[in-house]
């Protein structure tokens, strides 16, 4: 197997990606797919770090998304490549390409390979909240993450808090469900407190109307 992911690279070669199709790369790699994925991941880090440090002006980070796609096609369960790759893609200029939509697409690709990976759903929610200022979409993804096997108990309250800001009616419905069904006393307490706060906000809004 001969890969353009091998390191170190010469300065002229570092901006060239000979294989851009993950399917083609998988065919070339045969039984060496995990190794090839590791090599492409190393090149991804080199590419992102190099352009970030030098503040490259000529098509900065141009290979970032193709490299991440190759890496995760060669190894569909490469958790670090999905999670850190999404951070790289979403990072705003000049420190990154500022492509949150590509970051979300990468994490959604990860969910296709591992549908119950709550971390990917949580990361998508965070990108919606932090990079896209879309609290409603963030709340839906946090809620989805909280429902996945192995998700930590704190995810429910995070989703509830975000949803309260984005969609009070939906938040109230979910908070009541959480308060009634959770086996964790502290989760029920948070849900009940958020419900009380939400009701107070609605009462104030009616008085001001």
Task: Walk through the language-model features, giving the residues of each.
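Intrinsic low-complexity, intrinsically disordered or marginally ordered coil/linker segments
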Residues: 4-7, 117, 151-152, 170, ...
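Short secondary-structure transition/capping segments
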Residues: 122-135, 161-172, 197-207
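Helix-turn-helix repeat elements of alpha-solenoid scaffolds
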Residues: 15-21, 56-65, 95-104, 129-136, ...
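Short, hydrophobic/aromatic alpha-helical segments in well-folded domains
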Residues: 67-68, 106-107, 123-124, 141, ...
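Surface-exposed peri-terminal alpha-helical interaction modules
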Residues: 1-5, 108, 133
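Alpha-helical repeat scaffolds
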Residues: 62-63, 99-111, 135-147, 168-184, ...
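Amphipathic alpha-helical repeat scaffolds of TPR domains
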Residues: 32-53, 74-92, 115-130, 151-162, ...
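N-terminal alpha-helical interaction modules that lie
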Residues: 1-80, 85, 181, 199-209
């Amino acid at each position: 197997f001969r890969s353009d992911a091998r390191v170190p690279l010469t300065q002229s070669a570092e901006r060239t990606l000979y294989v851009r199709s993950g399917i083609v790369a998988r065919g070339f790699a045969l039984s060496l797919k995990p190794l090839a994925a590791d090599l492409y991941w190393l090149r991804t880090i080199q590419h992102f770090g190099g352009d970030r440090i030098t503040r490259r002006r000529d098509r900065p980070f141009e290979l970032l998304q193709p490299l991440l796609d190759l890496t995760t096609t060669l190894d569909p369960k490469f958790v670090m490549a999905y999670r850190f790759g999404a951070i790289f893609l979403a990072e705003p200029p000049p420190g990154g390409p500022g492509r949150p939509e590509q970051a979300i697409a990468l994490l959604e690709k990860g969910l296709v390979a591992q549908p119950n990976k709550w971390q990917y759903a949580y990361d998508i929610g965070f990108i919606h909240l932090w990079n896209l200022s879309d609290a409603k979409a963030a709340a839906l993804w946090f809620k989805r993450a909280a429902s996945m096997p192995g998700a930590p108990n704190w995810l429910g309250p995070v989703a509830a808090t975000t949803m309260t800001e984005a969609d009070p009616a939906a938040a109230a419905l979910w908070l009541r469900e959480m308060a009634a069904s959770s086996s964790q006393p502290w989760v029920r307490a948070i849900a009940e407190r958020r419900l009380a706060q939400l009701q107070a906000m609605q009462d104030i809004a009616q008085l001001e109307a």
